[in-house]
Amino acid sequence: MDSLVIISWIEHLYILLVLIVVITVLTSGKKAGSVMAWIFAIMFLPIVGIILYIALGVNWRKRRLLRSKFENSPNKVLSKMSSDMSKREISKYDTKDTFNTSPLKLDNVDDLTKEIDEYGGREISKLLYTTGGTYLTKNSSYDFYFDGGEAFDSIISDLENAKESIYMEYFIWKSDVLGEKIKDILLRKAKEGLDIKLIFDGLGSFGRISLKYRKSLEAAGIEFRYFLDVKYKLLKLNYRNHRKMVIVDSKILHTGGMNLGQEYIDGGKAFDSWRDTNSRIEGELVLHYLAVFISDWMSSNGKFNFILPKEIPVSDGDYLMQVSASGPDTIWSSLQMLYTKLITEATEEILIESPYFVPDDGILEQLQIAALAGISVKIIIAGKPDKKIPFWVAETYFEDLLNSGIEVYRYQKGFLHCKNIIVDEKISTMGTCNFD
C-alpha cells in the first residue's frame, strides 16, 4: 500500500512538472512551430522531453547576455549625457553605477523628425529609439568608400592624426600586411600617450592574430578584448559581434562592411577584387557609436576608463543619421524590425545589396507583396561566394522571388560584401548586417 501511495505521488508530481514545463514553453515567446514541437516532445517522451527542453530549449546563455548587456547598454551610456543638446561638460564616469540615470532626451529630436515626416521617417526613427535607445542625429560630413584601399587610407590618415583616443572594433582582425601597418601606427600612438582600446570578435578573429602581434600590443600598454572568446567555450559560437568601427578622438567615425584584413583591399587569393562599402562620418552620430563600443567593452570584462569628449558634440549639418544596434544580447530584433518597416513603407523602389540572402518568412513575404503590388524590387548578391553553404541556400529562394516579379542579380567583378538597402531614394541603410 505504501509503495502504491509513493507511486501515486510520483505520478502527480510528474504531471505537475509537465504542466509547469508546458506553460513555460507556451509563454516562452517562441514561434508557433517550435512551441508545438516542444510540447509534443514533452508529452510523448516522458522525462526525456523535459530534460531535452531544459538543456536545449531554454537559451540560458542569451538570458545571461541580456542581463549583462542591460547593465551596460548603449542607452544607459547615452543617458549619462546632458538632458539637452547645449554644449555642457560631461560628468566623469567612474563606475557602472553612474549609468543608472534618467534617459537622455535631446531637445532637437522633434525638430529633426519633422524634416523626414514626408516619407515616414518619424516612425522609423521612433522605432529605432524604442527598440535600441538611439536618436536621430545631425552630422556635418560623411564620405563613402567603395574601394578598400581608399577606405583604409582614410582610416590610417585619421589614426596618424589622432590626439587623444583610438577605439577600434572588428569582427575579423588579421595580423597580415594591413594588420601590421595598423599595429605600427597604434604602437607609435601608444608611446604618445593616447588611450587605445581594441575589440576582436572571439570567433571571427580566432586564429587570425598571431601571439607575437598580441604581445607587442600588450607590451605597448594597448588594451584589447575578445568578444565572447570561443577558445574554451564552444556554446558561445553562435553569439558573435559582427561590428566594424574605428572611433578617433570621439569625433571621427569609420564604419561599414569592411573588416581589418588585406583581402578587403586587394581581394586576397580567392578574388580579383573586393566590393564593399565603408564610410567616414563627423557629427553627433559618433557619440552613439562610442556608446555602443563602451557597451561592448564592458560586456567583454573591460574596465570603464575611457577618455570621453569634454563637450557633447553638436552639429548643424544636414546629414540625418541614426544607428541601429542589434544582436543576441538585445531584447528587440531592432534590425529585423527596421528592414520590415522599410519594406512596408516603400512606395516606388526597394534596392538591396548583400553577399548572402537568406531572409526569414516574414521579410520574404513582405518583399513579394511589395513586388506584386507594383513596387520595383531589385536584389544584388555575391556571384562568386566566399562561403558555399549560404550561397547555395540563397538559390533556394530564387524561384519564389522571380515568380513574384523581384529582380535578382549576381555580382561578377569580384566578391560583393556590402550590406545596403535603399528605399524610394529617400532612406538608406549601410552597415555590417547581412540579409540573412
Where do the protein language model's features map onto the residues?
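Aromatic (often tryptophan-rich) hydrophobic motifs at membrane interfaces
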Residues: 348, 366, 376-380, 407-410, ...
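Long hydrophobic segments that form regular secondary structure
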Residues: 335-352, 369-372, 376
